[in-house]
């Protein structure tokens, strides 16, 4: 069989059971009052190691790179230190066992990729400020909401209003509640009942683009820019400051919101309603645009590099893939012809595209948007300008190690390969449909590195760590429920894993029992 030939998938083969590793028992790790002997302790750790190793080899359903072996070999020595990047990353602080110098190198790397300009200088409003997150992008999104809430709030003025699409990560709904940020749904329902400019009731989130059905369940997962512009216009006209979140690699469909296209629609709205100061200087804007790039902010810059110079990188993303514009370099001319930068903040997860063994991430904004840190700097010896107090000092080391191992050319190759594998999986699922006579509903948003399809048996979902989502093909009708799963083509996924998954699907009892 040649390297490019897919294995033959059996047609309507008798259903075969799938071996599933049972999760470890809690009793295996119970800690008695007297502790454990070395033998007992090591046996327990060996059991966990074996379980995680097996699961790592089959993980394809989540945005989590498992390509981590190199860092483990070189960085184990740092486990001897209690490393804590306490406080602001641009000041060493009183706790000296820290890796802030490495953290700043990582921030500088992403500042270059995201066109954020110069390293932090409090006297330079156009310099960037940021830090490495101890959580994933959820923390970065919360920090953006917190910063934006305080930046946009004016005494005696209408309260800021947040907008995010129905494909936004579920943590956003939690974050607005925790931080007391009002959504357009909440304000519209309470203050402007019956006035939704889209007609009908105020939607809970900004609608996403519809698909062939006319509904969003089979759409690409990107925000409906027309609907967003209409909603923002309504609240801007009422004097409300505006917070907008865009997604770059949405949670289930991997979609990229059209940040540039949306900004082209929103900038005139901001100007019409006085949310963009005419004079410049220190006067605050009345809007904040944030990009949740948990996944996509890690690879989108390399798509653009390849698109801009295909000869240098030996590849260019096709028109369907595109090269999203989403970062601090996105500028548009205002009504007087002056360029206006639109993006105020970006969040990215480090454990997703790059690959770190635990949740972490990067938050970045500009010095001109910062507000004073609220707590006592004298205790920690540095401004407490970050969301967390103690911050993981190992994450900068691991992310730095990854970035130092991979050139820009290497990073372009990683995203090229993921795009290629996404196309391969989508094609093979269509072929499997034809071979089995079963509708698998394979779908891929253009440019996404995820493919979604019919939910198989619970055993297969567990074996391959598949993430699931239920949709109603007719909104409000529970009889039209469909169950989907998806596969993310992360750098640790290869064709052999996909072929093994396809083989399992061809023998799965739930799939085979589906009427043809």
How does the language model describe each region?
Residues 1-128, 482-488, 492, 505:
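N-terminal entrance/gating region of PLP-dependent enzymes' catalytic architecture
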Residues 86-95, 120-133, 156-160, 201-214, ...:
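Glycine- and acidic
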Residues 107-115, 146-149, 177, 400:
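Amphipathic, well-packed alpha-helical segments that form the structural scaffold of globular domains
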Residues 126-128, 132, 136-368, 372:
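Conserved PLP-enzyme active-site core in the AAT-like
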Residues 97, 101, 139, 223, ...:
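Conserved active-site and cofactor/substrate-binding residues in soluble primary-metabolism enzymes
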Residues 98, 102, 133-140, 164, ...:
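Secondary-structure capping and boundary motifs in well-ordered enzyme cores
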Residues 53, 112-124, 153-156, 429-442:
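Surface-exposed helix-capping loop/turn segments at secondary-structure junctions
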Residues 43-44, 49-50, 158, 173, ...:
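Conserved C-terminal alpha-helix-loop-beta "cap" of PLP-dependent enzymes
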């Amino acid at each position: 069989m040649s390297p490019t030939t897919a294995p033959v998938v059996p047609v309507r083969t008798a259903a075969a059971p799938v071996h599933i590793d049972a999760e470890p028992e809690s009793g295996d790790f119970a800690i008695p009052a007297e502790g454990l002997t070395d033998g007992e302790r090591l046996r327990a750790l060996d059991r966990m190691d074996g379980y995680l190793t097996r699961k790592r080899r089959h993980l394809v359903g989540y945005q989590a790179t498992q390509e981590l072996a190199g860092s483990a070999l070189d960085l184990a020595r740092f486990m001897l230190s209690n490393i804590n990047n306490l406080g602001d990353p641009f000041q060493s602080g009183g706790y000296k066992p820290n890796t802030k110098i490495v953290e700043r190198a990582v921030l500088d790397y992403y500042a270059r990729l995201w066109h954020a300009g110069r390293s932090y200088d409090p006297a330079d409003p156009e310099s960037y400020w940021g830090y490495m997150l101890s959580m994933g992008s959820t923390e970065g999104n919360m920090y953006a909401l917190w910063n934006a809430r305080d930046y946009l709030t004016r005494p005696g003025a209408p309260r800021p209003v947040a907008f995010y699409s129905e494909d936004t990560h579920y943590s956003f709904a939690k974050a607005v509640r925790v931080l007391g940020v009002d959504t357009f749904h909440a304000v519209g329902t309470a203050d402007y009942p019956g006035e939704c400019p889209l007609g009908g009731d105020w939607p809970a989130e900004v609608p996403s683009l519809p698909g062939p059905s006319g509904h969003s369940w089979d759409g690409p997962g990107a925000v409906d820019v027309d609907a967003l512009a209409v909603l923002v216009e309504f609240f801007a006209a009422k004097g409300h400051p505006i917070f907008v979140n865009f997604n770059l690699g949405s949670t289930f469909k991997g979609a990229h919101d059209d940040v540039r296209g949306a900004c082209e629609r929103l900038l005139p709205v901001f100007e019409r309603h006085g949310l963009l100061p005419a004079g410049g200087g220190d006067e605050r804007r009345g809007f904040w645009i944030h990009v949740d790039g948990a996944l996509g902010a890690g690879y989108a810059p390399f798509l653009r590099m390849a698109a801009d110079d295909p000869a240098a990188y030996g590849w260019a993303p096709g028109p369907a893939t595109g090269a999203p514009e989403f970062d601090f370099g996105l500028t548009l001319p205002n009504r007087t012809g002056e360029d206006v930068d639109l993006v105020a903040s970006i969040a990215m997860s480090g454990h997703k595209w790059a690959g770190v063994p635990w949740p972490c991430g990067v938050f970045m904004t500009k010095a001109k948007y910062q507000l004073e840190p609220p707590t006592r700097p004298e205790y920690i010896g540095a401004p407490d300008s970050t969301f967390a107090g103690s911050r993981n000092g190992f994450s900068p080391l691991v992310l730095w190690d990854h970035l130092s191992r991979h050139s820009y050319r290497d990073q372009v190759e990683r995203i090229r390969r993921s795009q290629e594998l996404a196309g391969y999986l989508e094609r093979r699922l269509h072929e499997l449909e034809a071979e089995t006579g079963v509708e698998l509903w394979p779908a891929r948003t253009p440019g996404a590195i995820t493919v979604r399809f019919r939910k198989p048996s619970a055993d297969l979902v567990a074996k391959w760590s598949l993430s699931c989502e239920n949709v109603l093909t007719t909104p409000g009708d529970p009889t039209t429920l469909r169950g989907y799963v998806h596969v993310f083509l992360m750098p640790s996924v290869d064709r052999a894993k996909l072929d093994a998954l396809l083989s399992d699907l061809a023998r799965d009892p739930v799939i085979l029992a589906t009427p043809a």
